[in-house]
Amino acid sequence: MKYINKNLTIEKVNVQKIAKKYGTPTYCYSHKQLTENIKNFKKNFSSFSPLICFAVKSNTNVSLIREIRKLGLGADVVSIGELMMALKAGIDAKKIVFSGVGKTSTEISYAIDKKILLINAESKSEIIEIEKIAKLKKKIVNIGIRLNPNTDAKTLKQISTGKKENKFGVDEKTFFELVNFTNYSKNINLKCLSVHIGSQILDHKPYEKMLNVVNKIIKKSGHNFEFIDLGGGMGISYEKNSKKLNYQKYNIAIQNFLKSQKAKIIFEPGRSIVGNIGFLISQVIYIKENIKKDFIILDAAMNDLMRPALYGANHQTIPVVKSNNISKKTYEFVGPICESTDKFTTIKGFQKLKEKDLVVMCDVGAYGMSLSSNYNLRPKPPELIIKGSKINIIKKRQKLKDLI
């Protein structure tokens, strides 16, 4: 994304032309950026060739997942719907891992039938259910056990998953009990130790701590794991000059870990693969100036992009047509939904805007459309993928007749 003659472009496409043809709000994805992200991720960990399973929850568009599959990735899924979507996108079942704390018997049965690589179990009750279903089907099922390493990922509490108060995984004592339990099962093959400490992680040190905990527990368990699933969580820079994850140091920590563990590493990245490929184009409906606060009211809303309302997350917001006419006022960029939390960002010194002007919210490729809803009975926006000068519609705009 860059400005050419003060006009914002995504790859080789003028954003104004996109808005004119497809309307607003509209999601756009850069294929070039997607390709670069996957290439760089593989390069960062090329010394041990991990299995990279894209976290489907971050973006569930089947066309986008097909592109990700073509670039060599598998899938991490957390529901039967995501598993179906991954298979529909052509991802090899042997490159799919099924995570999540609340898999139903229907979901477990479907995963077994599809012969996916691993079901990562998160409780004794779940393992008992897997064993029961596998026994009925007369099959042996490969599973992992998700460990909760009680490691602070130094991220937002809403997206922390590796501390003892979080619902995910099992504690050390329970982990050893479950390893022992699976040793006596005729229908379960314990292949993997799984761990995932959080999302939007920008510091390598929590990963180092996590690896130390995992290493000690594996040695203590005496079990030979074929796979170590380290989850994902690698963060991206949502704001200018923000901190970036040091992949080199994380890579070194994993290489040191692998000196004593002869297992295949699995990653489950989502945000780091698709986060910065996405842009949400929106139009100014009204400019509302009050005594205490001034507002830019957009046609995009929290139902289109939930992260700011849900986490207090901030997405860089920029004008589509650049101007040197800067306002001295502070504006809050909000949507039309009847909730006070329907706001995106607050900016002082933004360029002066008028009604029908266009803005773009950046880095919305992960947990943007996948968290969207029809709240206030608003149709969901379309999704486009841009390759050079070509625009492909990968999901059409919903119509009111589809909702009413």
Which positions does each model-derived feature cover?
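Active-site loop/helix belt of alpha/beta enzymes
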Residues: 150-287, 350
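Charged (often Lys/Glu-rich) extended helix/loop segments that serve as interaction or gating elements
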Residues: 19, 253, 262-404
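Conserved, mostly hydrophobic/aromatic
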Residues: 34, 57, 79, 111, ...
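A charged N-terminal "starter" segment
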Residues: 1-141, 180-189, 216-224, 389-404
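Flexible loop/turn segments at secondary-structure boundaries
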Residues: 60-63, 85, 152-153, 199-203, ...
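Structured core elements
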Residues: 74, 97, 118-120, 144-146, ...
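Active-site-proximal loop/turn and secondary-structure-junction residues that shape catalytic pockets
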Residues: 56-60, 81-82, 102-104, 123-125, ...
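Short acidic, glycine/serine/threonine-rich loops at helix termini
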Residues: 65, 88, 108-113, 130-133, ...
